[in-house]
Amino acid sequence: MGRDLDDVDRSILYLLQEDARGTSAKAMSDTIGVSASTIRNRIDQLEDDGIIRGYHPEIDYEAANIPLQVTFVISAPPTELQDYSEQIRGIQGVIDVREMLTGQRNIHVHVVGTDTNEITQITDAIHDTGAKIESSEVMRQRHVQPFNHFFLQGTEDMDARDDAVDKDDNSATE
């Protein structure tokens, strides 16, 4: 079981999900209201606890001239789920493998390729593992957003303070 996160941890996670590369500890400290060293220490602890497992770029595959993205839904025996998942992760062009907790359609695989020949090769490689492809869908677009449970703590208070400052500024000019 994981550990409980406080408001600072959740705020850090939210900001890192928005922009992990462009968000400095100083900028986060200004937004969250704690010191930059506290931010760095918390990030180190979140990494040590395995909550933050990495920092990954969001790639526009079409802009990288890899225009085809396909999602495969696969059935695998529950007792062999991890074995199939591991084999499939080793296939070139596979970028995401998700193991489902329930149901027969228990592996979802996201792949990319430059053309239908590459997608066919990936399909054949998946079949070679012994897994059964139940369906496949060509993906048009993928949208990712920060998990809203990791909302930025105190933003409501900061908005209220900004509104109060705006009112004070307006009353001073009247």
Regions found by a protein language model. Name each.
Residues 1-174:
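A compositional/biophysical signature of low hydrophobicity enriched in polar/charged and small residues
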